[in-house]
């Protein structure tokens, strides 16, 4: 029995999220996309021979921080300092996440002053997340978790026995 990505993604939850019209969910979806964009394009921009390398490193760090913000389950399973966990827990509301993503986007927009690179895509992605959280905040929508990634406590989540069988 092999594990597949489909076992970890909840398609029914995605449809439910789309119908909810809760912009905090959309912000979280773009947050997942931003994790991939920040890390991938950050690595890609390490090969420039200019000051863009610094912004590439910042982008990689941003991707890792967003990973812990958008997937809070990782805070419980990864050995992290208490200061870092407290820092991440500050961003549990729409308003704070809006400001966080806006600050991150501004940092990446500054990279354009050095050289126009693919980090513009990172900046735009972070801006979209910021706008989504801002709309949720102004509409007084409750911060809501998405149903895309299955919760490890769900009955149909692949457990240790499945992993042991695979090995």
Swiss-Prot record:
What UniProt keywords apply to this chain's record, in alphabetical order? Glycoprotein, Golgi apparatus, Membrane, Phosphoprotein, Transmembrane, Transmembrane helix
Where's it found, cell-wise? Golgi apparatus membrane
On this chain, the residues bearing Phosphothreonine are: 146, 153
Location (main, coarse) = Golgi
Q: Name one GO cellular component term.
A: Golgi membrane
Please name the gene that encodes this protein.
TVP18
The record gives the membrane topology as: Multi-pass membrane protein
Q: Could you identify this protein by its name?
A: Golgi apparatus membrane protein TVP18
Task: Answer yes or no on keyword Iron.
Answer: no
Q: Which domain of life is it from?
A: Eukaryota
> Can you tell me where the transmembrane regions are?
23-43, 49-69, 98-114, 121-137
Task of the protein: Golgi membrane protein involved in vesicular trafficking.
According to its UniProt entry, one GO biological process term is: vesicle-mediated transport
Which residues have a glycan attached per UniProt? 22
Which protein family is it in? Belongs to the TVP18 family.
Q: How does it assemble?
A: Interacts with TVP15 and YIP4.
Q: Which PANTHER family match?
A: CALCIUM CHANNEL FLOWER HOMOLOG
Is Transmembrane tagged as a keyword?
yes
């Amino acid at each position: 029995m092999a594990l597949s990505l489909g076992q970890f993604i909840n398609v029914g939850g995605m449809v439910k999220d789309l119908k909810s019209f809760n912009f905090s969910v959309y912000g979280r979806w773009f947050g997942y996309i931003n994790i991939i964009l920040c890390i991938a394009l950050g690595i890609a921009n390490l090969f420039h021979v200019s000051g863009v390398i610094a912004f590439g490193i910042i982008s990689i760090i941003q991707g890792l921080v967003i990973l812990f913000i958008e997937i809070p389950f990782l805070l419980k399973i990864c050995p992290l300092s208490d200061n870092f966990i407290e820092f991440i827990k500050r961003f549990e509301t729409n308003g704070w996440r809006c400001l966080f993503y806006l600050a991150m986007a501004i940092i990446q927009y500054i990279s354009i002053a050095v050289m126009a690179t693919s980090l513009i895509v990172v900046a735009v992605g972070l801006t979209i997340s910021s706008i989504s959280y801002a709309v949720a905040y102004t509409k007084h929508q409750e911060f809501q978790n998405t149903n895309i990634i299955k919760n490890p406590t769900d009955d149909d989540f692949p457990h240790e026995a499945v992993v042991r069988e695979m090995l």
